[in-house]
């Protein structure tokens, strides 16, 4: 009884080994047999008729296995591209991606104001010589209504033509950059660029490139370089400062930080912003009361009956 049981188990092990080898062999043979039979499970029993509008050669060439075979058999190599010939200017895909990320190149009055407010604002500026004046009554040509536009000081600054420019990451410190930027604040753009060209500061070259970039952006908006001046210019930390160990005597160490900064500026026009600021300063001076040596104030305290001199 035990002998027959052992013999049956031995036969079962042999059959499983044979079946597993056959199944593995059949799995490997299946794709080849299907490819030879044109993809039919019945092999040569049925005929694989070509589809209408396509040739047999087109189907074979379009199959994945044939495409791999053609690619492996092809002796021609892809043409090599010279990396030095690719620049930022001639890379069309990169330029399209940069343009898609940027905001549209237009003045703030065209993008922030509604059509009616834009007409009133432009009419107000046209009446007052190019800049906005408070409490000005405006009458549009196609309407009999009269309008008065009220804007805050912040809104007036935003709507006036201006150019915002920012630099790249600069290897310098805020203390060194401030010495140069204080000199350039309030100057005309062209004069500021000349000052940067003749300055011995290392950061002057990056600041000059920033101002030239702002001039180009202003020309796209229709602003003349001779009419631009630096309204605001400042610097700040760009973050991610590099640090390294400073080894000292007697096993002491320190940490040296390498600062990185950025420079940003706002360019405005002399024909609009400076004229408005001069007009507001003139109004403020006219409203100021005249200075007198002894003001007309009530007498405080007890005077007494004795004359005082």
UniProtKB/Swiss-Prot annotation:
One Pfam family per UniProt: Ribosomal_L22
Domain of life: Eukaryota
GO CC terms, sorted: mitochondrial inner membrane; mitochondrial large ribosomal subunit; mitochondrion
Compositional bias ranges of the Basic and acidic residues kind: 48-59
Alphabetical keyword list: Mitochondrion, Ribonucleoprotein, Ribosomal protein, Transit peptide
GO biological process terms, semicolon-separated: mitochondrial translation; translation
Assembly description: Component of the mitochondrial large ribosomal subunit (mt-LSU). Mature yeast 74S mitochondrial ribosomes consist of a small (37S) and a large (54S) subunit. The 37S small subunit contains a 15S ribosomal RNA (15S mt-rRNA) and 34 different proteins. The 54S large subunit contains a 21S rRNA (21S mt-rRNA) and 46 different proteins. uL22m forms the wall of the exit tunnel.
Other known facts: Present with 1800 molecules/cell in log phase SD medium.
Family: Belongs to the universal ribosomal protein uL22 family.
Biological function: Component of the mitochondrial ribosome (mitoribosome), a dedicated translation machinery responsible for the synthesis of mitochondrial genome-encoded proteins, including at least some of the essential transmembrane subunits of the mitochondrial respiratory chain. The mitoribosomes are attached to the mitochondrial inner membrane and translation products are cotranslationally integrated into the membrane.
Protein name: Large ribosomal subunit protein uL22m
Name of the encoding gene: MRPL22
């Amino acid at each position: 009884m035990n002998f027959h049981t052992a013999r049956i188990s031995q036969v079962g092990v042999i059959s499983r080994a044979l079946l597993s080898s056959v199944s593995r062999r059949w799995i490997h043979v299946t794709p080849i047999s299907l490819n030879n039979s044109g993809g039919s499970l019945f092999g040569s029993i049925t005929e694989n008729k070509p589809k209408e509008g396509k040739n047999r050669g087109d189907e074979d060439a379009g199959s994945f296995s044939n495409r791999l075979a053609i690619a492996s058999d092809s002796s021609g190599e892809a043409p090599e591209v010279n990396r030095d010939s690719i620049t930022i200017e001639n890379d069309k895909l990169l330029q399209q991606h940069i343009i898609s990320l940027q905001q549209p190149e237009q003045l703030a009055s065209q993008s922030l104001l509604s059509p009616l407010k834009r007409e009133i604002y432009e009419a107000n500026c046209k009446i007052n010589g190019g800049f906005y004046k408070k409490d000005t009554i405006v009458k549009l040509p196609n309407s009999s209504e009269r309008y008065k536009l009220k804007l805050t000081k912040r809104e007036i600054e935003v709507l006036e033509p201006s150019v915002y420019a920012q630099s790249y990451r600069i290897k310098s410190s805020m203390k060194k950059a401030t010495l140069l930027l204080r000199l350039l604040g309030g100057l005309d753009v062209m004069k500021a660029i000349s000052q940067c060209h003749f300055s011995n500061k290392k950061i002057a070259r990056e600041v000059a490139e920033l101002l030239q970039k702002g001039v180009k952006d202003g020309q796209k908006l229709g602003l003349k370089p001779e009419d631009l001046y630096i309204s605001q210019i400042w610097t700040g930390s760009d973050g991610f400062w590099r640090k390294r160990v400073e080894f000292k005597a007697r096993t002491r160490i320190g940490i040296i930080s390498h600062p990185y900064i950025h420079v940003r500026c706002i360019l405005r026009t002399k024909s609009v912003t400076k004229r408005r600021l001069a007009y507001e300063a003139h109004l403020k001076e006219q409203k100021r009361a005249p200075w007198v040596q002894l003001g007309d104030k009530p007498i405080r305290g007890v005077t007494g009956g004795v004359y005082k001199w």
